């Protein structure tokens, strides 16, 4: 374990003492340090009437147990404090460490002992994470240090788990959205599942906008998958134009219906454990699936501003600007009189995507988005540089396939009977509009691009993204983060995993940092918390995070690619083509082993290379036909320790998100030997060599120059490392599988790689 403590808020001695005393630690500024230390330690064992017993099982020095030390005349030193603090945090001498001071350095222990400031040290110790992944104070509260009295209690600017999760209110309401997406003449109703504590004051909300949450139709999804095999068709030269997105919600009027209490409840809904963490701390949890999902009405419009409006309507209802009904009969309205109107949105992938879309509406009441692995442009999810490009791991998927998956109204037989015929008509229109034949950007995709609306965002923004996420690729967060107004509070966590959550990792106190931020923004706590702009996981060291100022370096380093002409064949023999089509992972494995059709250029680095941004290939090439796909990957090549893609479980159920509530596993990305690592990659239709909106001819067998930006990343390579450039045509995971007999020839002497770095000019 290594500490990267973002969430602790430095405080005054007076505040620290007051907060310790409020928790029952009977310390005083006038006490001798050792006396305060003893009082603090005995309070930790509040379950014991005889606190001598647990103290006797800890050690203070190599010669004295802790009980004997406290009774002795020995002074409280840094060595004693550190050794005892480590044990309090769950580290075991002779098991986890032997040399205390060496271990303190190794784990980056965040507390610097000062006998004159011991109470501040103890205050920070309570706010420091244990080996198990929870802070010491959260561990104590989970054991019953404070009662579940449904009132807010704070420590170091963060809410504690004092809301009763054994007696929660669960209710369903139906919010009226200013939409008629299924064209039935009635405004769409949006089902909202609410879980909230029995609080006596108005409370904020965590909202997860998840089109998956009311169920998914995997059968329809699988039937809709598109065939990847086919020929890349040459396109007529032209300049693509689009109009600004012009979504207009329908008019609504305040309801005059009588107000009633909730008429529908539920017992269980799958939850997100970060929401559970906040539920125990006095935040309502709302799960909303939006238009076209089971329990709601409307059509699944998949990513456009109509879908986003269906989630926005819920925030409007929480603020008294929209109507919610107790049932589909629409005979009673229900008020959110328990809400303080402030909302934070959470969730990964599609869920985080809806957070970004919501933020671009500028809706009042949306205080914070915590968007993980979020899409900012749906074109960049299903297309890339003029090519149909399946998201990593899902060849054949497209937006109409996702519509089939998430249109969960068809899981209700009555809805299927009444509405499926019309749904199929609307789905057919969607399939045509997305234009899978050309792969071009068009109005359909522009209406699902949130980047042009980024200047409307006014809430606090937190993004997390994996730099090995080839599902929602890093360009998604790179573009939106760099499009945000400078006036915003914006924050980005970049890790080296794939499409994963990171709130339960051992090496970083993400949950606690979000607690401090949300208490500041949604509960009026003037806690002085400041979250860094960019927090990046160092790829060269285990469990190490660094603060950065920018995603995208201003310096460039030009790297030559060689002096030869190289030929890349597109065509495979029938057996290999079928084998790769059946298992794209076999293709990837053989590509990295040098067995596929490819050109490989190995570059031995003569100095450190701190990559930050979009690597760019400047190439001179020609195609034997009037078409061509170019795919590229940059590898950190050669055996050494690197991160794995998926977090591994360190300890099951070690994280308690409340008081014996919603336990989850502690995880961390493994750091182990590997033969290579993908640094970045990309695919390009050569007809789009001058940009996404420009289609050009490819003259047969004539040299052309291309500019090819790969996915952005932040990745540091060291002097002596090998940077491998892999160039090929068809990518069996992502692109159309065109087996036509053409070849690309590259003039390496007239080509080079341009690497953005975070070096100073």
Curated annotation (Swiss-Prot):
The keyword Transmembrane does not apply. Keywords: Aminopeptidase, Cytoplasm, Hydrolase, Protease, Serine protease. It catalyses: Hydrolyzes Xaa-Pro-|- bonds to release unblocked, N-terminal dipeptides from substrates including Ala-Pro-|-p-nitroanilide and (sequentially) Tyr-Pro-|-Phe-Pro-|-Gly-Pro-|-Ile. The active site is at residues 349, 469, 499. InterPro entries: AB_hydrolase_fold, Galactose-bd-like_sf, Pept_S15_Xpro, PepX_N_dom, PepX_N_dom_sf, Xaa-Pro-like_dom, Xaa-Pro_dipept_C, Xaa-Pro_dipeptidyl-ppase/CocE. GO terms for biological process: proteolysis. GO terms for cellular component: cytoplasm. Transmembrane segments: none annotated. Its main location: cytoplasm. It comes from the Bacteria. The keyword Protease applies. Its EC number is 3.4.14.11. It is an enzyme of class 3 (hydrolase). GO terms for molecular function: aminopeptidase activity; dipeptidyl-peptidase activity; serine-type peptidase activity. It is found in: Cytoplasm. Belongs to the peptidase S15 family. Homodimer. Removes N-terminal dipeptides sequentially from polypeptides having unsubstituted N-termini provided that the penultimate residue is proline. This is Xaa-Pro dipeptidyl-peptidase.
């Amino acid at each position: 374990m290594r500490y990267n403590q973002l969430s602790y808020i430095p405080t005054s001695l007076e505040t620290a003492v007051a907060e310790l005393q409020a928790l029952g630690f009977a310390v005083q500024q006038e006490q001798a340090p050792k006396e305060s230390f003893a009082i603090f330690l005995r309070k930790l064992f509040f379950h014991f009437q005889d606190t001598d017993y647990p103290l006797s099982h800890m050690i203070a020095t190599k010669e004295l147990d802790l009980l004997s030390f406290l009774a002795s005349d020995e002074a409280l030193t840094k060595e004693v404090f550190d050794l005892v603090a480590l044990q309090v945090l769950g580290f075991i001498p002779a098991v986890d460490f032997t040399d205390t001071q060496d271990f303190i350095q190794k784990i980056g222990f965040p507390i610097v002992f000062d006998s004159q400031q011991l109470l501040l040290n103890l205050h920070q110790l309570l706010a420091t994470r244990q080996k198990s992944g929870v802070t010491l104070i959260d561990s104590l509260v989970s054991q019953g240090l404070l009662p579940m009295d449904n009132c807010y209690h704070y420590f170091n600017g963060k809410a504690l788990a004092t809301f009763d999760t054994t007696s929660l209110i669960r209710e369903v309401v139906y919010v009226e959205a200013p939409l008629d997406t299924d064209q039935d003449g009635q405004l769409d109703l949006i089902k909202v599942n609410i879980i909230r504590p029995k609080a006596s004051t108005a409370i904020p909300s965590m909202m997860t906008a998840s089109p998956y949450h009311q169920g998914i139709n995997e059968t329809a999804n699988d039937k809709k998958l598109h065939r990847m095999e086919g020929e890349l068709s040459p396109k007529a030269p032209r300049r693509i134009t689009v109009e600004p997105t012009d979504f207009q919600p329908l008019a609504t009027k305040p309801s005059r219906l009588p107000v009633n209490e909730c008429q529908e409840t539920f017992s269980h809904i799958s939850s997100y454990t970060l929401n559970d963490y906040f539920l125990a701390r006095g935040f309502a949890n709302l799960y909303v699936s939006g238009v076209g999902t089971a329990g709601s009405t409307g059509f699944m419009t998949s990513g456009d501003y109509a879908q986003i409006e269906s989630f926005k309507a819920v925030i409007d209802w929480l603020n008294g600007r929209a109507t919610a009904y107790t049932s589909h009969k629409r005979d009673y309205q229900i008020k959110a009189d328990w809400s303080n109107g402030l909302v934070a949105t959470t969730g990964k992938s599609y869920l985080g995507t809806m957070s970004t879309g919501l933020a671009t509406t500028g809706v009042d009441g949306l205080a914070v988005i915590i968007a993980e692995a979020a899409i900012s442009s749906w074109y960049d999810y299903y297309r890339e540089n003029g090519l149909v490009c399946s998201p990593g791991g899902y060849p054949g998927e497209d937006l109409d396939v996702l519509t089939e998956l998430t249109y969960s109204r068809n899981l209700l037989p009555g809805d299927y009977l009444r509405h499926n015929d019309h749904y199929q008509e609307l789905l057919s229109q969607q399939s045509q509009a997305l234009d899978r034949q050309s792969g071009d950007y068009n109005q359909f995709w522009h209406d699902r691009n949130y980047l042009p609306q980024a200047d409307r965002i006014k809430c606090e923004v937190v993004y997390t993204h994996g730099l090995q996420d080839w599902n929602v690729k890093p360009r998604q967060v790179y573009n939106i983060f760099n499009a945000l107004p400078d006036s915003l509070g914006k924050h980005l966590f970049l890790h080296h995993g794939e499409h994963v959550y990171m709130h339960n990792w051992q090496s970083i106190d993400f949950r606690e940092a979000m607690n401090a931020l949300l208490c500041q923004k949604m509960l009026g706590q003037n806690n002085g918390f400041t979250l860094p702009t960019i927090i990046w996981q160092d790829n060269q060291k285990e469990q190490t995070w660094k603060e950065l100022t920018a995603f995208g370096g201003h310096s460039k380093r030009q790297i030559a690619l060689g002096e030869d002409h190289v030929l890349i064949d597109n065509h495979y023999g029938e057996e290999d083509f079928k084998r790769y089509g059946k298992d794209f992972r076999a293709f990837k494995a053989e590509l990295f082993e040098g067995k596929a059709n490819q050109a490989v250029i190995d570059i031995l680095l003569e100095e450190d290379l701190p990559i930050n941004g979009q690597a760019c290939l400047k190439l001179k090439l020609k195609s034997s036909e009037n078409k061509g796909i170019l795919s590229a990957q940059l590898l950190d090549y050669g055996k050494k320790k690197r991160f794995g893609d998926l977090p591994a479980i360190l300890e099951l159920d070690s994280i308690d998100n409340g008081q014996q509530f919603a336990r989850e596993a502690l995880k961390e990305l493994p750091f182990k030997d590997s033969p290579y690592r993908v640094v970045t990659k990309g695919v390009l239709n050569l007809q789009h060599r001058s940009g996404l909106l420009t289609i050009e001819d490819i003259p047969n067998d004539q040299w052309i120059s291309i500019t090819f930006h790969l996915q952005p990343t932040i990745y540091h390579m060291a002097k002596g490392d090998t940077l491998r450039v892999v160039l090929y045509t068809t990518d069996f995971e992502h692109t159309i599988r065109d087996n036509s007999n053409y070849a690309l020839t590259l003039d390496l002497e007239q080509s080079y790689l341009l690497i953005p770095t975070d070096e100073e000019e």
